[in-house]
Amino acid sequence: MLPFAPVEDPWDQEDMEVFGSTSSSEPQVVFTMKNAATVMREHERKEVNDLKMVDEPMEEGEPVSCRREELVKEVPITQHVKEGYEKADPAQFDLLKVLGQGSFGKVFLVRKKTGPDAGQLYAMKVLRKASLKVRDRVRTKMERDILVEVNHPFIVKLHYAFQTEGKLYLILDFLRGGDVFTRLSKEVLFTEEDVKFYLAELALALDHLHRLGIVYRDLKPENILLDEIGHIKLTDFGLSKESVDQEKKAYSFCGTVEYMAPEVVNRRAHSQSADWWSYGVLMFEMLTGTLPFQGKDRNETMNMILKAKLGMPQFLSAEAQSLLRMLFKRNPANRLGSEGVEEVKRHAFFASIDWNKLYKREVQPPFRPASGKPDDTFCFDPEFTAKTPKDSPGLPASANAHQLFKGFSFVATSIAEEYKITPVTSSNVLPIVQINGNAAQFSEAYELKEDIGIGSYSVCKRCIHSASNVEFAVKIIDKNKRDPSEEIEILMRYGQHPNIISLKEVFDDGKYVYLVTDLMKGGELLDRILKKKCFSEQEASNVLYVITKTVECLHSQGVVHRDLKPSNILYMDESAHPDSIKICDFGFAKQLRGENGLLLTPCYTANFVAPEVLTQQGYDAACDIWSLGVLLYTMLAGYTPFSNGPNDTPEEILLRIGNGRFSLSGGIWDNISRGAKDLLSHMLHMDPHQRYTAEQVLKHPWITQREQLPRHQPNSDEPPQEAVAAPYSVLARNPNRHHPILEPVTASRLAQRRNMKKRTSTGL
């Protein structure tokens, strides 16, 4: 048996200044040990306490007795069925969609048809017995046993377990938010606040398992699910080990190799401490977008885990760096968490966490997954959800296999009490969003009418719903020119806000995406400005209040619009009341990403672009405030602050913005209050750090005391139409020069790496 891996920390003496860039050196790997293939061959010949150590699943005919740990797990257990309730069977569930598929079976979205929980949605994990080797069968039964025993707010709940002659069924919580891996693949990396929240909830889940004597052993983003609110739930217990404490340690070689602790790679005895190493790997990946130990193949990855020196990313906070160093201890006895979760909770990285509120799910998650109807699967891989859900007959397994799963059936004891609720039916499902399959379905459901607007990547048309004869608007986006996924997610997540355009349906034919929304019959704010020439101060303040209040809501959720302008702000009806305003066109909107919250991709409409975008210094929510400042200026003056007329070139407009030169004196400005000018000067401040936030704008006296503002329109000698329309006509003639195509996050090298190598360890 090989000795323990070296106990020194895996960090370089000199930290890396920039981590993960092409110019930085790769983590230094020291290959002074036997290669991993030799290690594995040696261990295949070794026995520890008479337990044969094999990495591959055993064949059907191999004696089960060679694995004592598996033999123990074949002891039949008492059937868990509440008195008076019948056992579940496949006929009691309607198959709705395929959520995932592996070599052993599928995961379906299902709806219960009978019983006290009729109408409830579940995830149904179906495994074919004939496809499972002996070790996999043991793992499946182990997963069922653990889920029966575990009851925790951050661990997926098992509601039913049953079997047929050829298949095994686990009926679990359906988590609409998908998994953390999917979110990480889309966003590449998370902010430290996001990571802190996920790690804190995960720490409580791991502690609960450890207190029950369970080592999880397969911690990775794919096994952490998000509910519709954004809280986590740990799932997939096929590799977990029951009844393991400091005196009774596990020896199995299992898990996803990139997340394995050194003692697991070395096939030495391991306990709960191994989970805290994997916890550190997960933290590192979420913060940096890359794995700390990943070679060109499995063997090199194992070598790196045992020997590699790794640079500490310097953009991480001191607290985050400290936690990583304490988790990445190659000696498990020295690893943070080896003495229990309390030492993890006491670490400075979690200083802002209220653990009691967290356990009660009273802490607001930093990210709310896109979700519409209860059975919406937008957060799941369309490769699976597009398939027709079909539970094919399973081949009968051997008699020995049936004996192995004796006592597999289970019904949650709280099933009647838990589901004294209104069943989910078509009448009470919120008709917000439905992801539909193709354009044929759109043409069957809607009749296209005239154009409403034409953009660089899309066209907006009026349409009529054939069944109800109700008018809607549809935005048709060319997927070859723009990735609409982020716009769809943001609209799905925040479309319930009264001042954000609501998304009704989404159709995708592969080339075009069709976004069906409300038809805004009141027209654009731009049209109203042109019609009135300028607003009274009271009307301008009322309009700015509604828009800024909506923007504040978006900013609090880490969303920036990045294209706020009068043509993207519409009235719901012809009353033109400020409360009927809705912000539309989220084509340039983004969720803030990165530890510093900055965005580096410039996209803008001239006149409404902040100066720091032009210099590509990165920008955050302050750019939206700049755009709102330009909007306020335009409402009060009837023209934009940086355009002199229709003959202005884009270069001239952008140069004036870069210089930050605008006038608040002379002409119409002699009739504008000092309060309005003061607010404008703060909203159009050149320095984004000194520019007002949305919250500060809302607290300004010109907003809070708007009922006292003048209601009359000031006289204006300016020709407003040409001045206001100039930037838009210029951009219409030169769309590509000032609206660069933004490549989706999936085009990044990190996202491509994830797409090429989808890590799996248990098949499902």
Swiss-Prot record:
Residues 93-350, 446-706 form the Protein kinase domain. The modification Phosphothreonine is found at residue 601. PROSITE patterns: AGC_KINASE_CTER (PS51285), PROTEIN_KINASE_ATP (PS00107), PROTEIN_KINASE_DOM (PS50011), PROTEIN_KINASE_ST (PS00108). Keywords: ATP-binding, Cytoplasm, Kinase, Magnesium, Metal-binding, Nucleotide-binding, Nucleus, Phosphoprotein, Repeat, Serine/threonine-protein kinase, Transferase. It comes from the Eukaryota. Signal peptide: none annotated. This is Ribosomal protein S6 kinase alpha-6. It comes from Mus musculus (Mouse). The gene is Rps6ka6.
